[in-house]
Amino acid sequence: NPQTSYGTQKVIGEYLVTDLTRKGYLDGRSLRLPTIVVRPGKPNLAASSFASSIFREPLNGVVAECPVPERTGIWLLSPRKVVDAFIHAHDLASSAWGTSRVLNLPGITVTVSEGVAALRRIAGEAVAARVQHKPDERIDRIVQGWPVRFRTPRATALGFAADPDIETVIRDYIADEGIRVR
């Protein structure tokens, strides 16, 4: 039940994949992704950009501005796990999908305060202090409309997995990017 034009566009794409699969033109699979954290690269203009920035920028010596309250929860999945999910979706037999070709991937819910606390435990106070709260009502209004918890029993039954915790997500980003901490 999409609540935005963006969500409507995504559902239209999912329906097309399902319909073309039903007609035998392709063997399609549509994955609904949580917010991907920690994305490498630079911040962008997406409302979700802060979710990676509050980790990525401080670990790279740069101040990050967090536009939402510390209590804000984010449903997330790491780049490693999303790559694993795409490979797993490809490798699953067509029969495993049945007639439903759309799947919400598992993820974990982390609040901004939990994420910053994990960053502090891993990289120290000086790094965590680079996260500065600068409220942005426009972004906050968008983010507060996002669900923060999903039940994904079908995905789990098909072998898809979430990250175990935010500490693992942060440590994997540090390892993947070759960042030295402490």
Predicted regions and their residues:
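Short-chain dehydrogenase/reductase
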Residues: P2-V11, N44-S52, W75-L76
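Flexible, glycine-rich beta-alpha linker
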Residues: T4-S5, Y25-S49
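Amphipathic terminal alpha-helices
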Residues: H133-P135, P147, T152-A157, P164-R182
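Active-site Tyr-X1-5-Lys
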Residues: Q3-R29, N60
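A short C-terminal helix-loop "cap" of Rossmann-like NAD(P)-dependent dehydrogenase/epimerase domains
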Residues: I36, S52-P67, G124-Q132
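Mid/C-terminal beta-alpha module of Rossmann-like enzyme folds, strongest
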Residues: V83-A85, A89-D140, R180
